[in-house]
Amino acid sequence: MSTYTIYLKNDKSYSCDENTSLLRAALDNDISLEYSCFEARCRSCRVKILQGKVENLQDEKVLTAEEKAAGYVLSCNVVPRSEVILDVEDLAVKLPKPQVTPCKINNITVLTPNIVEVVLRLPPKIVFQFLPGQYVDIIRNGQKRSYSINHSQCEANELRLFIRNYEGGLFSQYWFNEAKPNDLLRMEGPLGTFFYRNNPNCEEIVLLATGTGIAPIKAILEQLQSTPELTTHKKIWLFWGGRKKEDLFWQPKTTLPNFTYIPVLSREEQWQGAKGYVQEIALQQPIHWQKAQVYACGSEVMIQSAQKLLSEQGLKEENFFADAFV
């Protein structure tokens, strides 16, 4: 089996064999690169090849023809065929090591007819650390689904998840019709690189969410609340979108001095607040996009639209962080 060296532009490097993706090998070597789904669907791990040869593990349908021609690949979906130089730096943060552990359902709270909050209880001896914004995979009957943790700290060895009922969803039948307290499941995590990056050059923090995409945004907001030194002199905006009033099942409670919350609905006729889509409502606000950071979680459509619209207003590519539900 051949093994190759993968180089980053900040002079770090790691080894990767011919059967392992660039992303998986990086994480195995404690090199933190952007990622989310591991399934070549979300674009989070997009990276540019400056030199070297790689091969796709599966057909890739996310990147545009222009991106491919420019040398972009999804690091979760390519294996090396030579030494490779990537046009990327590592995240300069040590990610908590994912672990697979049993867990039990502590309780299930119905928030709306289609949304529940599930509280999972971890074994007493498990020390579970995560960055606010990360997610876990719930494993049942050999299948897995991803859910974002909706809080910033693991207290009493409990994790809380917002879960939506999707018609035909693989786990929806279980969560909404079968699940009960003390059910035994397995969990893998924490996963993903959706978390707050403290950038002293940014003056505004913009949080965008649709539906249960509010979960990691809520976690990040709690983190900012508990560490006010991270947001001194920064304005924080939260735009949370849904179709109907019942979709806004959570109310932010924060004492941050420069915080603005704008709920957005698209199909509520009697709604007196902002109507439309979160990215479009955000554009109507006096936000200095050239000096802003954006954290977006929710539908792929929202995230792709937000990145395009906001970049046209001056938002820097490196200041847009997203976690798409795929």
Task: Describe every region a protein language model picked out.
Residues 31-53, 69-81, 216:
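Local cysteine-cluster metal-coordination motifs and their immediate loop/turn environment
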Residues 157-158, 163-326:
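FNR/FR-type flavoprotein reductase catalytic core
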Residues 15, 36, 79, 129, ...:
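Residue-level "contact hotspot" at macromolecular interaction interfaces
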Residues 1-33:
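N-terminal pre-ligand scaffold of iron-sulfur
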Residues 50-53, 89, 141, 190:
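Short, surface-exposed secondary-structure boundary micro-motifs
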